[in-house]
């Protein structure tokens, strides 16, 4: 579809890092939030990957995503424990060094009482060379940004706070608009017409979502475009096709 190739589109990839996500022990709550957040400010989330706490896998994913999209966001793996290896992996992906950052250390020293900035906690101040810090208003330990990669915590409340901190710095594109058409018929009855409408309106993205309503198969059709006039024409065509199919 051509809509996701528009020159004014700002794109993003999201990398979720953590064995606990892949094992099912922790249920991810960040993907949906980030998708909603980015859509609202005019950034298209185009790809999500989930990788384990394995340096080679993180490096591979980061390098693939950062070369493909305007922005990359990561969550997870920047805490104080031995398996929090995201910062080191990002440094390796960019080919830079990593050490305790004086700015990050000062933040942690101001946050923890005297004598409580343990070596484990100090790990959270290790930042790749050349990176900027991302403010953490919840628990203070910062995330960081290096080039187009934004590295954030996995805890949802902290990730959301970090996202709020970086949002003003992000370039945004024209927002994707949407209009919904409900069809009181199964998806198969409208599939061919939707394909024809999609071909007629290449600037749109048309998705159909089958549902069950009061024991009947129904379909919700969502038409998306950055151009409101084109979106409305395509949605009107969908509504006409639905009425015709219902009348058959």
Features from the language model and the residues they span:
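Glycine-rich phosphate/diphosphate-binding loop of Rossmann-like nucleotide-binding domains
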Residues: 4-48, 52-53, 229-233
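Short coil/turn connectors at secondary-structure junctions
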Residues: 9-12, 67-69, 128-130, 139-141, ...
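Glycine-rich beta-strand-to-loop/alpha-helix junction loops that act as flexible
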Residues: 17-19, 74-82, 153-154, 225-226
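N-terminal small/polar loop signature for handling phosphorylated ligands or for N-terminal nucleophile
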Residues: 32-85, 90-92
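Short beta->alpha linker loops
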Residues: 50-53, 103, 122, 185
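Proline/glycine-rich low-complexity loops and linkers
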Residues: 57-63, 84-173
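An accessory alpha-helical subdomain
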Residues: 148-241
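Conserved short beta-strand edge segments in small beta-sheet-based binding/regulatory domains
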Residues: 241-248
